[in-house]
Every structure is written in C-alpha cells, then in structure tokens.
From Swiss-Prot:
Name this protein carries in UniProt: Flagellin FljJ
Signal peptide: none
Primary gene name: fljJ
Chief localization: secreted
Protein family per UniProt: Belongs to the bacterial flagellin family.
InterPro entries xref list: Flagellin, Flagellin_C, Flagellin_N
GO CC entries: bacterial-type flagellum; extracellular region
Domain of life according to the entry: Bacteria
Assembly: In C.crescentus, the flagellar filament is composed of multiple flagellins of 29 kDa; 27 kDa and 25 kDa.
Amino acid sequence: MALSVNTNQPALIALQNLNRTNDDMQAVQTRINTGEAISTAKDTAAVWSHRPGAGDMSGLAREDEPGSGDIDRGRGPRAGESVSDLLKLMREKVVAAKDTSLTTTSRQALNADFQGLIKNLNQVLRSATFDGANLLDGSQAADMSFLADADAGQAITLTLQNLSLGGTINTLTATDDILDPVNAAGVLTRLDATLSAVNQAVGNIGTQAKQIDAHNTFVAKLNDVLETGVGNLVDADLAKESARLQALQVKQPLGAQALSIANGAPQIILSLFKGG
C-alpha cells in the first residue's frame, strides 16, 4: 500500500471499524437496560408495532367494563338469592298466620315480622345497584351489553330482571298484611307464585353471569398468549446480549489500538529521509 501524507486510508478504515464497534456496544447496552430487542421503529418497524401495549386485549375483559366485575363476581345472583331466601322466610310467617287459633297478639307479631322482611327485601334490591345501574329493581330502562370482540361488532347482553314489589315477577306489595287468616291465605297464593318466578329469574341471571365469567377467562388466556407471542418478538435474550457485550468490550480497545497504529503510519515517511 502506498504511503501518503495526504490520505491515510488505513486510519480511515480503522476509525470506521471503531465507530461501528461503539455503535454496536451502545445498542447492546440499550437492549440490556430496557430488556427489549427492539427499542425504536427504525430497528425493525414490523416488530416494533407489536411491542408491549400495542396489541393489548385487556379492553375486552369484562372486569374493565363498568359494572361487569360486580356481575361476574356474583353480586346480581347473590342479591337474587337473598330475595329468594327472604321470600321463604316470609312464607313461614304467612303459613303460621293461617292458623285460626292464633291470638291477636301473636298474629300482630307475625305481621310485624312479615313487614320487616318486606323492608329487608327492598333493601336487598337497592344493594344490587352498581355504576348507576340495578339488575333487579326494574329501574334500568334497557338490558346491559358488554363488548365481546376487539372490533366492537359483538356484545354479550345481560337481560335484567325486575324483582321489585308489585311487578310481574314479584306480585307481593308493601301494603300486604297477614292480620287475619283470609289475608294470609291470599298472600300465600301470590307468594308461592312469586317464589317460583323469582327462582327462575335468579337462575337466568346466574346463567348469564357464568357466560360473562367464561368470557373473562377466555380473554385473560388470550391476553397471555398474545403477551407471550409479543415477548418472543421484542424481548432481548440477555444471555446472548451479555456475550455480545463481552466480545465488544474486547473489540473496542483493539480497534482503538489499530487506529493508533494506523495514525502513526505516516511517521514512517520521515524515516525514509533520515540519514541521507
């Protein structure tokens, strides 16, 4: 190779190699620090678009929908079951009130218990309210729908049930009393029909709640699969990166030494003119 004081090609090549080593070391250190193989879109655009968060499916989980967490955890079904239990207790009071041999005091005591159970029933219905909606008291104008796919093209619908007093399911009223055997007999007839209808309504709510819960489970598993797939694309292999870093740490001083040697090459020209 010709020696020249104007152009030092070996030094330029050595500098390029050293710069490349420094860039590689910076890239390796970034991957180690972030844990990601892809840190910017310019690295690999197609893979960068799948970085964590880009394909998040959590929006489909029913727990992220208003009120759905309360439904699939059983608030609606549990409230309905409580209504059914209260109706059974009321039935015991009504059956006892049909006894014609009861004293007035005993009958009044039974009626007081009956009225207290009606108040408890209303309280249970009010407790089924969440996020401004109530599944059981008939105050909600329309059924509740929840997003079921990423394109918002499908929904899971929860059919509401009206278990409030004086409705089509619960025909009891707040003014009912069991102060005499005749009233008690009439209340018992409506109460038996109400109990059957309430149990059916609660069963429907439970079935739909299971559907929502199953959807939650499916979305959670799907999210895990997506997260694993994305991780395979963007996560850095730290074992490999550690090996690369050690190699570059050796390569970097060697490159600096090569550049130093190349920079000193023009000095050889001076020796050609000495001792003449």
